[in-house]
Amino acid sequence: MACWHSDCMSDPAHEPLALDDAERRFIRAALLDWSGPARPTDDLAVAMGFTNAELLSGEAWALWDRIESGAALTQEEWRRVLLAIEIVFASDVVGSGLDWRVTSGLSDEESIKILRGLQRKLPRWRGSVQFRINDAGRVEINDPER
């Protein structure tokens, strides 16, 4: 069952999330960029669920190691991963932003397509009129033609 409120975000994951090669490459590049061009503040790191700016890159890389090994992440851990990749990809202020293509080797067009796919695949933390949660707890698009 999907979690719609913060009380269940720390529930352990039941099984590892199946990711394709493009999703893995994107997540790896995004989490790695917190060690490179991205420049978070302590406030931002904490808001994303990490300890502070200095430890963010190590904590993000530890999450990647777990993803790469096929370990199941909790909903809270997936929330941190998703927020970290959204910010590092899009923000030119604290993330990779305009340097993304150079640091990741991925085009913006390819990256946004992968990111939107991940946003649909990962656990939802808020409701949406565009999506519903099916019986398996996965996000489905209400109207694919929208």
Question: Residue locations for each model-derived region?
Answer:
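Positively charged, low-complexity terminal tracts
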Residues: 2-146
